[in-house]
Every structure is written in structure tokens, then in C-alpha cells.
């Protein structure tokens, strides 16, 4: 029978930690029998990595795939708990701990190409080897180092896209698509409310309008020969489909709301994760025209920002609640 019955980490459930916050928790170690010379410790670790395959040499009549990758270490802190008289009796023992997150950290992130992850790990070691350990992954929201002026935060936005279309062999018309927003700068978890106006100057009916929020991630990596490479990958974060009935030569307005995820990478190269990746966001409204085999799209750049933690905030005050992340170990 093992000396250690269990080791557990006690942390606030479903918490999202802002960069610069304090992480408070407990390690609960339960022993079946007395343990001599134990080492009980807890670690806070934050890392990021990107990796993808890239074809090279196509212009030289040969091609081969090379692996491009990059990595970053964001935080690694360790606390070893003092043990009185260097032994622990059978039963449960509780150890309190806290860690200060650095003020500049990227947000938790996962994709097929890259991951940014954070975890707290508790362990108990005997004289020669690890007897037990426990790991919990954290959700961390990064903060912005580049702040946008009050004017850019408040100015309403208006975007218009117009397309002339041909249909039924010799018929022609125009579709005009407009998006209006009170602002285009948001924080994670906020509501994005926007109005779309569709002016249908054709003799056909428009039945479907699709709204989507995209993240365009620019990854930075290196080949085995230390040559810098980059790659851009886009993903759809949110999507809504409006089943409309916009009749011929008519105009319709649609008011939509997106509830942004509670954790998002902040926009642009001013973020801490910019050494391996940076993210841009875009809201796209699309009117599909199946009778012309084409579509009309209007695009609005979206800025995601997050203010640094106030020095007066308590540990509980700089946390929110969100679904737990999937660990990188579970994704592979």
C-alpha cells in the first residue's frame, strides 16, 4: 500500500484569472502512514508553443515538408512547504499557497497549430522519487499593453458593401449591405450589438443572412535551420444565421447580438504572446445569393482589449467564472 493516499488541489471552480492577479489555493495531502523526509511543493507554470508543417523547394523542382515551430515560457514559480521535524503523520495535511501572476501574460489559447496554457501542479516526493502529484489547468485572460483612445472606443462605425449581380440570363440588380455598430472595441465576455441593413434592388427574394466573428491568427516559427517562417490561420469563433424573407426591391434591418467568449487573446502585436502569435478579429455579415452563385460580404475589424489589474483589487476581485479549458494533454 502506498504511503500517500491522495493529493488534491483546492482552487476556485471555473475561475478566469486576469494577468497580474493573485492565485490562492490549498494543497491537501492525505497519508496512509507516516512519511519521513517529505518534500511537498506546488508549481505555477505557463508556456506557449506553435508547430506546423510547411512545404519548401517547390520552385526548385523538388519539394519536402519541414516542421516549423516556436515556443515561449511565460511563468514558472515554485513553493516548497516547510515540514516541521521533517515528518508527516498518517491523515490529512493542508498547505496554503498563493502565487502572483505576472502583469503581462497572454491569454489561454488553443488551436491545431498553437497552444498557450497555464497550470498549477502539486507534488509529494519521498527520499528518491515522486509519490503523488496533481495538476489543474487554469484559464488566464491576458491584458493589453496598447490602449486605444476614448475616441476610438466610442465612435460609431458604419461599413457598406455593394455588388451588382446578374441573374436569369439578362436581368441585373444591386445588393447593398450595411453594418452599423456603436463601437468596435470590446472586452472578453462583453456583448457586441450591431445592426445590418440589406437593400435588395433585384427581383429575387433573399432568404439567408449569416453573421460570423472570425479570429485571424498570425503564427511565428522557425525551421530546423533557424529560418524564420510565418503562417496565418483563420477560425470562426461565433456564428448566427438569420432566416429572412427580404422581398424584391425592399430593405430590411436586422439587429444581432454576439456574446463574446470569457477568454480571448487581446488584439494586435502589443500583446505578450506576439513573439509566437498575434490575433486580429473581424465581424463578417454575408448575404448568400444562390440564384447568382455569389454572395455579398461586409467586414468590420473588431478590437479585443483587457485592462490591467488595479493594484487595489483583491484576489477574488480579479476573477470571473467560465467553463474549464481542455488541457493540451487531452487534445492530442
UniProtKB/Swiss-Prot annotation:
One Pfam family it belongs to = Arrestin_N
Keywords from the UniProt entry: Differentiation, Membrane, Spermatogenesis
Q: Where is it predominantly found?
A: membrane
Q: Does the keyword Disulfide bond apply?
A: no
Its GO biological process terms? cell differentiation; protein transport; spermatogenesis
Localisation: Membrane
InterPro entries associated with the record: Arrestin-like_C, Arrestin-like_N, Arrestin_C-like, Arrestin_domain-protein, Ig_E-set
Region Disordered: start-end pairs: 311-332
The record describes the protein's role as: Plays an essential role in spermatogenesis. May be involved in the anchoring of the sperm head to the tail during spermatogenesis by affecting SEC22A-mediated SUN5 and NDC1 transport and localization.
Q: Which family does it belong to?
A: Belongs to the arrestin family.
The name this protein goes by in its record: Arrestin domain-containing protein 5
Amino acid at each position: 500500500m502506498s504511503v500517500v493516499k491522495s493529493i488534491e488541489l483546492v482552487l476556485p471552480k471555473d475561475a478566469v484569472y486576469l494577468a497580474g492577479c493573485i492565485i490562492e489555493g490549498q494543497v491537501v495531502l492525505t497519508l496512509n502512514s507516516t512519511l519521513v523526509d517529505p518534500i511537498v511543493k506546488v508549481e505555477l507554470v505557463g508556456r506557449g508553443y506553435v508547430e506546423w508543417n510547411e512545404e519548401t523547394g517547390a520552385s526548385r523542382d523538388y519539394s519536402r515538408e519541414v516542421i516549423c515551430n516556436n515556443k515561449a515560457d511565460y511563468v514558472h514559480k515554485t513553493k516548497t512547504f516547510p515540514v516541521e521535524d521533517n515528518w508527516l503523520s498518517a491523515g490529512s495535511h493542508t498547505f496554503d499557497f498563493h502565487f502572483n501572476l505576472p502583469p503581462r501574460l497572454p491569454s489561454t489559447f488553443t488551436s491545431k497549430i498553437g497552444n498557450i496554457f497555464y497550470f498549477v501542479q502539486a507534488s509529494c516526493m519521498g527520499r528518491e522519487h515522486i509519490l503523488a502529484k496533481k495538476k489543474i489547468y487554469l484559464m488566464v485572460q491576458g491584458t493589453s499593453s496598447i490602449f486605444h483612445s476614448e475616441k476610438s472606443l466610442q465612435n460609431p462605425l458604419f461599413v457598406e458593401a455593394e455588388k451588382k449581380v446578374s441573374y436569369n440570363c439578362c436581368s441585373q440588380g444591386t445588393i447593398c449591405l450595411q453594418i452599423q455598430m456603436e463601437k468596435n472595441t470590446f472586452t472578453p465576455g462583453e456583448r457586441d450589438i450591431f445592426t445590418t441593413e440589406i437593400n435588395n434592388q433585384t427581383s429575387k427574394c433573399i432568404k439567408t443572412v449569416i453573421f460570423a466573428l472570425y479570429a485571424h491568427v498570425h503564427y511565428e516559427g522557425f525551421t530546423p535551420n533557424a529560418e524564420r517562417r510565418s503562417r496565418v490561420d483563420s477560425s470562426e469563433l461565433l456564428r448566427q444565421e438569420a432566416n429572412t424573407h427580404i422581398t424584391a426591391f425592399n430593405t430590411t434591418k436586422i439587429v444581432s447580438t454576439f456574446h463574446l467568449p470569457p477568454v480571448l487573446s487581446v488584439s494586435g502585436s502589443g500583446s505578450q504572446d506576439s513573439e509566437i502569435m498575434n490575433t486580429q478579429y473581424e465581424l463578417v455579415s454575408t448575404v448568400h445569393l444562390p440564384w447568382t452563385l455569389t454572395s455579398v460580404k461586409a467586414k468590420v475589424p473588431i478590437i479585443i482589449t483587457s485592462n490591467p489589474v488595479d493594484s487595489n483589487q483583491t484576489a477574488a476581485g480579479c476573477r470571473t467564472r467560465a467553463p474549464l479549458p481542455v488541457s493540451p494533454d487531452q487534445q492530442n
